[in-house]
Amino acid sequence: MYLILLVVLAVYVTYKLITTVLPHHLLIPSQNWREKISYVVKYPKPIYLKVGTKRSSYRRRLILASENPAFYTNFINNKLKISPNDCENGDGFLNEMSRRDIDDPKRRIIYGFFHPYANNGGGGERVLWQAVKATLLADDKNICVIYTTNIEAQPLDILNKANKKFQIDGLDHSRVVFIYLRKFNNLIDGNYWKHFTLIGQLFGGILLSLEAMYELSPDVWIDTMGLPSSYLLVSLSLKIPILAYTHFPILQEDMFGKLKFQKLKDLWKFNIIKFNDYFALGKFIYWSILYYFYVYLGSKVNIALANGSWTFNHLSKIWVFNTALGNVLDVLYPPCGTEFLIKQANLNQPRSNKLLYLAQFRPEKRHALLLKEYSNFLSNNFPNVTQITNKFPTLVFAGSCRTADDTATLKFLQEQVAKLDLSRFVEFRIDISYDEVVELLSSCKFGLNAMWNEHFGIGVVEYMARGCTPIVHASAGPLLDMIGRNDQQENCLNNWKTDGGFFFKSYDDPDLDPNLQKNTETGYIKFELFDQFIDYPTFETLLKELYVNDPTIIEDSKLLKMRQIDQNRVAEKFSNKAFNKKWIEYINDLNTLEKQYREEKRTKVEQVY
């Protein structure tokens, strides 16, 4: 009994520390803060501002008053130094530091972007930097803070890389503050944890967010990397709005399908004399705890944005409380930087009869599946062919090798090409430049995607933007968001031919239901989607339909019309402009929520800091 009381007391004390003591420590500087800062500003030579453990509250005051907030990064070290320009400004700088009322029109807002791998240069970073740009464009008073673990890269290097790789130009660098996280960065890396990886990463996310808050507490928390455990302390301590941009849910209901005990009602099957059942029970408890913790974390998100319909559908099943709580759950397609591709594209130029596949050389991209079915297509329809002709297409695999595993996959594919005697008909383009990628997009007739359940698929968007007609696997992003989809229940969902491209399926698909295939035409596979039964061709059968059975489907005039439709669709849905417009709307909503949270959830003293 006493033990239970002690546990309850410990939980209560911890909760009060997190919800009352910690926010006071993070947000409110010491009583003599103005005198401390004034002393350093007026000191005849540069000295550090000694603030003890209250770096967050002091850094907030400096950033919110400074003409150059970016100066207050902690790249060199965590010590606080005042900008020479701010010292020169003297009394003007000190006056700007005055506490601001909630409705003060001069009050600035700090948007904290929690993205530890801000310098990595992938699709997630494209979203981050376009979101930062849009946030700065939304209001001159907005300041963006980037929480990163890329301690090897200086702020200007990171910004230059974003500009070069994603064409993020015109950023007001003075309003972008980098906060470097050094203590717990390894804890969010899956390779760090030998066992219980997910729970370890969640724990790491909590500690990393605490470090971020300790260095600088923002007014709005934005997670663009998918680290949901960061929402816990942010919501409890800072009491600020949270926006989460989710590329891929870390947990899904489908995961329980691999367990022996999938629901509570399945526990009646438990056999007390079977050791394996104890192990299975442990897995069920482990995944259930994680799953409902993820559900709880989702309920803390005010605006949850999914990168596409596939992710949105899964989040809708998991974050079930969001709608009931009045929170937003919506789709915001990532900015794909397609303006350049569209602007320079000549849709009327002649194209080579080639199938281009832009993808890293990884097993899940399923290059081997394409090779096997392409080989079958040739042997069944063009037996003993030795020369390239216009009667059938050739393959181009263009991609990069980032790891030793990627290199091994590439070597295997090259061996398969030799084994299948396809060397004349398959071309590999490895680690090519972006200019070479654009040249391929401009010259190849079709673009391929064979991945099962690719949640988005930016490569397909690039095909569409440059006029490379998509031939893609009918699943997830390419199916639900891209090729010929205007209405979720219609158009692309009832035919393998659409106004923007073509679909195929595979007998190797994990969601294949053998019971549906009994009366299906040879070469076609039946799938159920949104309560409809649809017959999709295999890749081999699709090529036969296009090149043997009815080549008029892909005559130049029809492909030109498809290219025009695809390009318009890209401009409307996947451009940077489309992203900016919707993002700024959400930023305005967050601005309103930030005022509301200050007024309703904070103490009178915390409100003005």
From Swiss-Prot:
Superkingdom of the organism of origin: Eukaryota
Lumenal compartment residues: 1
Function: GDP-Man:Man(3)GlcNAc(2)-PP-Dol alpha-1,2-mannosyltransferase that operates in the biosynthetic pathway of dolichol-linked oligosaccharides, the glycan precursors employed in protein asparagine (N)-glycosylation. The assembly of dolichol-linked oligosaccharides begins on the cytosolic side of the endoplasmic reticulum membrane and finishes in its lumen. The sequential addition of sugars to dolichol pyrophosphate produces dolichol-linked oligosaccharides containing fourteen sugars, including two GlcNAcs, nine mannoses and three glucoses.
GO molecular function, one term: GDP-Man:Man3GlcNAc2-PP-Dol alpha-1,2-mannosyltransferase activity
CDD domains membership: GT4_ALG11-like
Entry protein name: GDP-Man:Man(3)GlcNAc(2)-PP-Dol alpha-1,2-mannosyltransferase
Reaction catalyzed: an alpha-D-Man-(1->3)-[alpha-D-Man-(1->6)]-beta-D-Man-(1->4)-beta-D-GlcNAc-(1->4)-alpha-D-GlcNAc-diphospho-di-trans,poly-cis-dolichol + 2 GDP-alpha-D-mannose = an alpha-D-Man-(1->2)-alpha-D-Man-(1->2)-alpha-D-Man-(1->3)-[alpha-D-Man-(1->6)]-beta-D-Man-(1->4)-beta-D-GlcNAc-(1->4)-alpha-D-GlcNAc-diphospho-di-trans,poly-cis-dolichol + 2 GDP + 2 H(+)
Subcellular location per the Swiss-Prot or TrEMBL entry: Endoplasmic reticulum membrane
Intramembrane segments: 196-216, 456-476
Transmembrane segment boundaries: 2-22
